[in-house]
Amino acid sequence: LEVEKEHHCAGLRVYYKGVTGIKEGNYIELHFLKDFLPGYFWIFPLADGQCNVGVGMRSDYVGKKRINLKTELNNIIQKYPQLSERFKNAEPVDDIRGYGLPLGSKKRAISGDNYMLIGDAASLIDPFTGEGIGNAILSGYTAAQQAKEAIESKNFSGTALKKYDEAIYRRLGDELSLSYRMQKLVKYPWLFNFVVRKANRNKVLRETIMVMFEDIDIRDRLRKPSF
């Protein structure tokens, strides 16, 4: 199948040990850096004290701008003082690896005669954060429920299994759509900077952004002008 690059993210990751400055609670970090927009740099703390470190950018921009993600990953760690200091004594513990991330920014059919797609196969990765584990678990659970119903009714037709699509998009559709709009915001540095500056001055907005990855109702508040 041909990759729809505007709905696909190219990403690189490497595991590090010794990264400092990890906040209590092991929050994930997304760094939107001026020279790397509309891409982002991430630090995901792991249970063993290591960190998943990487970069991601929509595949169409990687192609248009001829971005070398491996070069950018190393440059970001070395170039920005707020990061280079934290990586001063850190060491990679494996090789850099590349991944393609199918984003949930486009609604697709995720079932048909005798099959249902879950997780990355269903393109359910969050278009803004790049996170996909939660949606993969949810889709797997939902598919299992639908499979049970199909077995009991002995009906594995696309028409019957379409209930799975409906259940997934009823639960995730608004969230994925909102994340796609937020992804587009990053394309406009002046507007993105405006939001960040406002967050620095507004505690409610700042806390909303911090927890937006966990709650669709809270994330939806970002669309309202009351901030």
Language-model regions, residue ranges each:
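Predominantly flavin-linked oxidoreductase catalytic cores and closely associated redox partners
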Residues: L1-F87, P102
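Generic structural signal for well-ordered, non-membrane alpha-helical segments
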Residues: K5, K65-L73, R108, N114, ...
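Short capping/connector residues at structural and topological boundaries
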Residues: E6, G21, D35, F41, ...
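Flexible, active-site-adjacent loop/turn segments at secondary-structure boundaries
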Residues: A10, V14, I28-L30, K34, ...
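Short, charged low-complexity linear motifs
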Residues: G25-L30, Q146-E152
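FAD/FMN-dependent oxidoreductases across multiple families
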Residues: G63-Q146, E152
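C-terminal helical "tail/cap" subdomain of flavin- and related membrane-associated enzymes
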Residues: K148-F227
